[in-house]
């Protein structure tokens, strides 16, 4: 399995895997802050679902997104599937992931567990990374179809993809053949591209999301309006 490392720094704690790529960052000064830009862009999915009641996460990392959503949405039920028990242990022990009845953390292989899930979710957050990018079996079209089956008609899948591995274009094509609507936002210059997919037959123009972005920004203290400018439809 992947070696889990926790790096202790003066003002922050980092979760890294064997190759030293930073997976998650926890600010000791602002423990609930989403430090890494990509994690904030994952939350841009709230534009399409401003008050989620149920979220499925594939991949836990340090749990910063899970923790943030847990605090911001007091009614939210979250299910997390993480294959590495060491990651789950580290998230609870070093990254303040609470043990709470609203958080169901399952140590399992998502490819095996997802098809057995009976419920549907408002949002699915696909953020599973190994040593070198997303595990291939989680980016294949048959798995995307299984995720689509766990969504309501108007729900969204939000995925963190790596543009530097050479197969990004192919992965984006698979999203396009799985979902009627696909949008993308470049989260940073390092190569994180966030994709948003839904079965909706049509979605509003970008400018029509302005009011939602403004409202989300007021309630959740993330710069949704700035992030909205990076959002583009994939044709």
Show the residue positions of the predicted features:
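S-adenosyl-L-methionine
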Residues: 17
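C-terminal substrate-binding/active-site "lid" region of AdoMet-derived donor-dependent transferases
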Residues: 141-204
């Amino acid at each position: 399995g992947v070696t889990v490392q926790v790096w202790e720094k003066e003002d922050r704690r980092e979760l890294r895997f064997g190759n030293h790529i930073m997976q998650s960052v926890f600010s000791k000064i602002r423990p609930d802050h989403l430090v890494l830009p990509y994690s904030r862009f994952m939350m841009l999915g709230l534009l399409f679902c401003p008050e989620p009641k149920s979220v499925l996460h594939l991949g836990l990392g340090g749990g910063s997104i899970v923790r943030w959503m847990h605090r911001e949405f007091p009614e939210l039920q979250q299910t997390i599937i993480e294959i590495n028990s060491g990651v789950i242990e580290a998230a609870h022990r070093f990254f303040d992931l609470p043990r709470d009845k609203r958080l169901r953390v399952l140590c399992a292989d998502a490819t095996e567990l997802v098809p057995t899930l009976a419920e549907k979710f408002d949002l699915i957050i696909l953020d599973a990374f190994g040593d070198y990018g997303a595990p291939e079996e989680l980016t294949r079209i048959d798995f995307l179809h299984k995720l689509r089956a766990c969504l309501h008609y108007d729900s969204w899948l939000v995925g963190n993809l790596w543009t530097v591995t050479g197969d990004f274009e192919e992965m984006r094509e698979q999203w396009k053949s799985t979902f009627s609507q696909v949008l993308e936002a470049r989260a940073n210059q390092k190569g994180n591209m966030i994709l948003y997919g839904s079965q909706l037959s049509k979605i509003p123009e970008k400018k029509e999301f302005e009011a939602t972005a403004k409202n989300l920004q007021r309630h959740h203290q993330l710069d949704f309006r700035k992030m909205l400018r990076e959002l583009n439809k994939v044709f």
